[in-house]
Swiss-Prot record:
Annotated family: Belongs to the TMEM147 family.
Source species: Mus musculus
Protein name according to UniProt: BOS complex subunit TMEM147
Pfam families, A to Z: DUF2053 (PF09767)
Tissue occurrence: Expressed in cerebral cortex, submandibular gland, hypothalamus, pancreas, liver, and ileum.
Compartments (UniProt record): Endoplasmic reticulum membrane; Nucleus membrane; Cell membrane
Length: 224
């Protein structure tokens, strides 16, 4: 039973990444090592973020919720956008190729570093726990999030982007950066359950994805 539970969690977490890699055409471009390079960049960016947070922002230990402090901590996630831009700027090719390489490499590195060990240790435990199913589902939401963020970075860094599109792209980037902060605040204020919080994150990420896709199609059509 425990091995079956671990297999379900592992498949739910990792197979969407494999399917995305195969179906997006990245395998035809031999982009595996490009994705690995994106993952290495992810590790470097996360190390810089941790050092910055540990130096300038103390850990919140309960009591009154520090709204301003948590907002400032969330602002550090701008470094992810900078890292994604760095990855895309070092890859030649079409826009969708750059976006998928950066997003898939970034999301896979996060999956391995933040969820691999908890799944291996926890999902193989004696007792069944829904939190590992939730963790696996959340990894799929993260994949969509990084695809969305990469598309936004690609659009905003186009030198020929029409000025009419720029405010919309910047707004979507702002929402992507502070989405986790907003969700955490709602969970804290309204004491949302784990499934409710996961559903809310999925809905918000889906809305951002649809908005970004519509804007991406408009930008590509205008500049084609």
């Amino acid at each position: 039973m425990t091995l079956f539970h671990f297999g379900n969690c592992f498949a739910l977490a990792y197979f969407p990444y494999f399917i995305t890699y195969k179906c997006s055409g990245l395998s035809e471009y031999n982009a595996f090592w490009k994705c690995v390079q994106a993952g290495v960049t992810y590790l470097f960016v996360q190390l810089c973020k941790m050092l910055f947070l540990a130096t300038f922002f103390p850990t919140w230990e309960g009591g009154i919720y520090d709204f301003i402090g948590e907002f400032m901590k969330a602002s550090v996630d701008v470094a992810d956008l900078i890292g994604l831009n760095l990855v895309m700027s070092r890859n030649a090719g079409k826009g969708e190729y750059k976006i998928m390489v950066a997003a898939l490499g970034w999301a896979t590195a996060e999956l391995i570093m933040s969820r691999c060990i908890p799944l291996w240790v926890g999902a193989r435990g004696i007792e069944f726990d829904w939190k590992y199913i939730q963790m696996s589902i959340d990894s799929n939401i993260s994949l969509v999030h990084y695809i969305v963020a990469s598309a936004q970075v690609w659009m905003i860094t186009r030198y020929d982007l029409y000025h009419t599109f720029r405010p919309a792209v910047l707004l979507l980037m702002f929402l992507s950066v502070y989405k986790a902060f907003v969700m955490e605040t709602f969970v804290h204020l309204f004491s949302l359950g784990s499934w409710t919080a996961l559903l809310a994150r999925a809905v918000v990420t889906g809305l951002l994805a649809l908005s970004t896709l519509a804007l991406y199609v408009a930008v590509v059509n205008v500049h084609s």
